[in-house]
Amino acid sequence: MSADVNPPIAEAFEPDLLDSLADTVLGYGVKALLVKLGQRGIYLRTAAGEVWQKGGRGLEGLDDHWHDRALWAPAYRVVPNGTTGAGDAAIAGFLASILQGAVPETALKMAAAAGAACVEAETAITGLTDWDELWARIQRGWDSHPLDLQLYGWDWVEGQGLWEKSA
């Protein structure tokens, strides 16, 4: 049996590589970097407070909960039907959460949920789900994939159902 020389790109991303990528991207003035990683979940890194002072449409109401954060949410388990539109759905779930004034933990879980709902649907359009319906599914204990990585310097936040990088 030969090794897979072309693994899916999401499997190539290790936590240290993501941190390095995030440092570079945030260095360009980006306020929030969201990286969808398939079954490995979804990664969020946000800029320090001074970058947030510059504002930006839709971001005015975000408080210091959004400053200088590194979060990683697991992918929710679904029976997959296709991945078309899953990334777009995840971004839409994230942005909808921001517009509703959600904290980063909620926005990240909603991004993972919206992407998962799209993957389990027959088409990208039928995977579009109401925000309240997705949140209720998360609250009911939607099962997630275990992360097959060692996250050194990250802590599992039990009440939130995600990992946060230690300061």
What positions do the PLM features span?
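Conserved phosphate-binding/catalytic region of the ribokinase-like
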Residues: 3-167
